[in-house]
Structure formats: structure tokens, C-alpha cells
């Protein structure tokens, strides 16, 4: 038997906590026997004193075990259970293509996703732009979709890592969100509760990333890989660029539209293709679905070319209560904004810099994201045809096309887009799309 205040005191004095102490405290968070003040105190001591790798693994596993941990053995799946998690960005629509692509190659992807947070878009918000799409199927239906379709994208239920929800809410109001061990545990508790064989992390770097610097993004990626592997799940991470909008669009319906066009081969943004392929390759290798990168890329290209990935996406949409003919008739189902009009730079030149975070906030300001959890979303608004870094813009080539609900909203977004994108006489060197891979 432990006392919460003694655990806090021990960590306050710079000592490492035992697995039993950490589990006692996390179970207390779940059972409401630990107060909000005690949660805040422990969070602050961890913020200042950090955690050893064994502590980080214990914290993550205790938070995972605070609720249901999914088990797929009874389904007798004939392939690995794998997933991807992104730290979030703008125009990051990879999940919608990656899930069906990996499923078409023999993987099973029980993806538990989130809503938009701050400037970053949320996969669930994008999918809810599809009429009828159900992000909370019951457990039996979820398992049925995984077995028969291969991929489902759902929201986090109260039974998964419930301690994380309360812990995070306290961190949010006590300036302890940006602690590497706490971020790591929060991300992984939910992902490891999916009962995975392998996980791939997409950790963003740049002006639209969650972490403010390359060094911190790298530190987070290394922490996640170390903890997840320590918890028994094969995990690798890719550091990918978020110094510009990843897709050609940013919003909800506009990104779903781009995802369908990507899967059907109608249009594939080169940077989006590179990131999606790189993440899928990692998933196939980690899951034992390919022997090397060359084989993995060939398999992935094949399921794109032969329409299998697009077909699986369509089956997932139908299985989650969306329209059965969505892939063929997506334009009929996706909402369109009242006003769609291009915004041009004030001068001709090359795009040299982009404040990706500001572009994400411009979409939020139009109604495409939430400022607070209770806000409703306008799924139709957003940006499309985004200019890329290094691209020439002029009176013919706009910075973007803005899809807005009114002229006033368009004007506000146009000013934000122009302020967020720097245009100069000479083209700057563009960043790599994938900076590095971390496997241990």
C-alpha cells in the first residue's frame, strides 16, 4: 500500500519511482482516489526531474492497462496487427490512404484516431465530412470490420486508457503538456491499447509541427521508439517535414476529396505520396509483410495501381455506415463551400517560407476546426491547390484556392494566407520530406 503524497515526495526529491508505485498512482487517477492537485503535483515533478527509461515504460504500460487492451487472437487473423500515429500537422491526410494500402498488402489496422487539436487537423473530423460515417461502432462491429475489411478508423472510447484522459486534462491546465515522458506515455497508452504487433510513428518537424524544434522532435521520436519497444511492440519512427502543408489541401471535405483522388490515381501530390509510401513501407517491414524496402514499395504500388487500396477504402466507408458508392460518387456526397475563389500573392516570385501553423489556424478561423471542444465544424471550408515551397507564383498561379462560407470569411482567410506565405525573387532550398528513420 502506498500513499500518493509519498510517491510525489519521492519524485520531487529526484528519485526514480518503482513500477508498483507508478501503477498505484495511475490506478488512483482512474479510480478517482488521487486528487487533481496530486495529479498536477506529480506532473510538475516529472516535468522538472524527467523519468528514466524503465519509469517511462512503467508509466506507459500502467496507463495502457488502466482500461481495456484489445486482443485479436480470437479472430485468427492471417496477418499482423499494425498501426501508424502522427504527431499532427496541416494537410496530413496520410491515414486515409495508408490504412487501406497496408490492409490491401495483408495487414490489419485498428486505427484509433483523434479530433483536430489547435492548428492540426483531426482524422475523425475529416471522416465525419462523409455523410453517415460512424466513428463509434460497437466493439463487435469494430472487430468484424477489422476481420473482413482489414482497416477501421474509429474514435477513442472511454474504455481505452481512461487514466490518460484525466491525466491529460490536468496537464492541459497546469503547463505540463510539453514534457517528453508525459507526451510519450499519453500517445503510447492509447496506441498500445490497440493490441498491436507493430507501430510506426510519424513525428513532424518544422513550422506546423507539435514540437517547436528539430531537436525536440527528434528527442520525442527517440523516446517513443524506446518506450514502445520496451513495452514489447516493434516500433520505428520517421521524422517528416511540416514546413509546408503536406497535401495540396487543408480542411475536412477537401482533404477527403484529395485522399480519394490519391487512391484512385486521379491526382497524387508528390510530397504526400513520398510520406505515405515511406510510412507504409515501415509498416510492411515491421509487420513482416515484406522482406525489404524494394519488395514493400512494389507491393504498395501494385495495390494503388490495381485499385485494391481504393476498393478497401470504399468498403471501410460502407462498413462504418457511409455511402456504399462513396469512392465512385464522392463529389455527390462531400459538402462544398458557398464561395471558392483563388488568393494571389501581392507580387510575383518564389515561395520561400510558409508559416504552416498559421495556415492551419486560418482553416480553424473559417470554421474548419475547433477553438474549444464544444464547437461545431463546417466540413466544407478549407484551402486547396496550395502553392509549394520553391514554386513560382504570379497572376496566373495563386497561393491557394480558399473555400469559405461567406465573402467576409474569405477576406479574412485571404489576409491570413498572404501573411503566412513568404514570396521572394530567388527560390530557397527545399527541405527533405523524410529527415531520418529511428529504430532504437
From Swiss-Prot:
Protein family (similarity comment)? Belongs to the thymidine/pyrimidine-nucleoside phosphorylase family.
Pfam families, per this entry? Glycos_trans_3N, Glycos_transf_3, PYNP_C
Q: Name one GO cellular component term.
A: cytosol
Q: Which SUPFAM superfamilies match?
A: Nucleoside phosphorylase/phosphoribosyltransferase catalytic domain, Nucleoside phosphorylase/phosphoribosyltransferase N-terminal domain, Pyrimidine nucleoside phosphorylase C-terminal domain
Q: Which UniProt keywords apply?
A: Glycosyltransferase, Transferase
Protein name, per record: Thymidine phosphorylase
This enzyme's EC code(s): 2.4.2.4
Biochemical pathway = Pyrimidine metabolism; dTMP biosynthesis via salvage pathway; dTMP from thymine: step 1/2
Purpose? The enzymes which catalyze the reversible phosphorolysis of pyrimidine nucleosides are involved in the degradation of these compounds and in their utilization as carbon and energy sources, or in the rescue of pyrimidine bases for nucleotide synthesis.
Its BP terms in the Gene Ontology are: pyrimidine nucleobase metabolic process; thymidine metabolic process
Q: Which reaction does it catalyse?
A: thymidine + phosphate = 2-deoxy-alpha-D-ribose 1-phosphate + thymine
> Has UniProt tagged this entry with the keyword Magnesium?
no
Q: What is the lineage of its organism?
A: Bacteria, Pseudomonadati, Pseudomonadota, Gammaproteobacteria, Enterobacterales
Fetch the InterPro entries from UniProt.
Answer: Glycosyl_Trfase_fam3 (IPR000312), Glycosyl_Trfase_fam3_N_dom (IPR017459), Glycosyl_Trfase_fam3_N_dom_sf (IPR036320), Nuc_phospho_transferase (IPR035902), PYNP-like_C_sf (IPR036566), PYNP_C (IPR013102), Pyrmidine_PPas_bac/euk (IPR018090), Pyrmidine_PPase_CS (IPR017872)
Q: Name one GO molecular function term.
A: 1,4-alpha-oligoglucan phosphorylase activity
* Known partners and oligomeric status: Homodimer.
- The yes or no answer to whether the keyword Glycosyltransferase is present is yes
Amino acid at each position: 500500500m502506498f500513499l500518493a503524497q509519498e510517491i510525489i515526495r519521492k519524485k520531487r526529491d529526484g528519485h526514480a519511482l518503482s513500477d508498483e508505485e507508478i501503477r498505484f498512482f495511475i490506478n488512483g487517477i482512474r479510480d478517482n482516489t488521487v486528487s487533481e492537485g496530486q495529479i498536477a503535483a506529480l506532473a510538475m515533478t516529472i516535468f522538472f526531474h524527467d523519468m528514466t527509461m524503465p519509469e517511462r515504460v512503467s508509466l506507459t504500460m500502467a496507463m495502457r492497462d488502466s482500461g481495456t487492451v484489445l486482443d485479436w487472437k480470437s479472430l485468427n487473423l492471417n496477418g499482423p496487427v499494425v498501426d501508424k500515429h502522427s504527431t499532427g500537422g496541416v494537410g496530413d491526410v496520410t491515414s486515409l490512404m495508408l490504412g487501406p494500402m497496408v490492409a490491401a498488402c495483408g495487414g490489419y489496422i485498428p486505427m484509433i484516431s483523434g479530433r483536430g487539436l489547435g492548428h492540426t487537423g483531426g482524422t475523425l473530423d475529416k471522416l465525419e465530412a462523409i455523410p453517415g460515417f460512424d466513428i463509434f461502432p460497437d466493439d463487435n462491429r469494430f472487430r468484424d470490420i477489422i476481420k473482413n475489411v482489414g482497416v477501421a478508423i474509429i474514435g477513442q472510447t472511454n474504455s481505452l486508457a481512461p487514466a490518460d484522459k484525466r491525466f491529460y486534462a490536468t496537464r492541459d491546465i497546469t503547463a505540463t503538456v510539453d514534457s517528453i515522458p508525459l507526451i510519450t506515455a499519453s500517445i503510447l497508452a492509447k496506441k498500445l491499447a490497440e493490441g498491436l504487433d507493430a507501430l510506426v510513428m510519424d513525428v513532424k518537424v518544422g513550422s506546423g509541427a507539435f514540437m517547436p524544434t528539430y531537436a525536440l522532435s527528434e528527442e520525442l521520436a527517440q523516446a517513443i521508439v524506446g518506450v514502445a519497444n520496451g513495452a514489447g511492440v516493434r516500433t520505428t519512427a520517421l521524422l517528416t517535414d511540416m514546413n509546408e502543408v503536406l497535401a495540396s489541401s487543408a480542411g475536412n471535405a477537401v482533404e477527403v476529396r484529395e485522399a480519394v483522388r490519391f487512391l484512385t490515381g486521379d491526382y497524387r501530390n508528390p510530397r504526400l505520396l513520398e510520406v505515405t509510401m515511406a510510412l507504409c513501407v515501415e509498416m510492411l517491414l515491421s509487420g513482416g509483410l515484406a522482406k525489404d524496402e524494394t519488395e514493400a514499395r512494389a507491393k504498395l504500388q501494385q495495390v494503388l495501381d490495381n485499385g485494391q487500396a481504393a476498393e478497401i477504402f470504399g468498403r471501410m466507408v460502407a462498413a462504418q455506415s457511409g455511402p456504399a458508392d462513396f469512392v465512385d460518387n464522392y463529389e455527390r456526397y462531400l459538402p462544398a463551400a458557398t464561395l471558392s475563389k483563388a488568393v494571389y500573392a501581392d507580387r510575383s516570385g518564389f515561395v520561400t517560407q510558409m508559416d504552416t501553423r498559421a495556415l492551419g489556424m486560418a482553416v480553424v478561423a473559417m470554421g474548419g476546426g475547433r477553438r474549444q471542444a464544444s464547437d461545431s465544424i463546417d466540413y466544407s471550408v478549407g484551402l486547396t491547390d496550395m502553392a509549394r515551397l520553391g514554386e513560382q507564383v504570379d497572376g496566373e498561379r495563386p497561393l491557394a484556392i480558399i473555400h469559405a462560407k461567406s465573402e467576409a470569411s474569405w477576406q479574412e482567410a485571404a489576409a491570413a494566407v498572404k501573411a503566412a506565405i513568404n514570396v521572394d525573387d530567388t527560390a530557397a532550398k527545399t527541405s527533405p520530406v523524410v529527415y531520418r528513420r529511428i529504430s532504437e
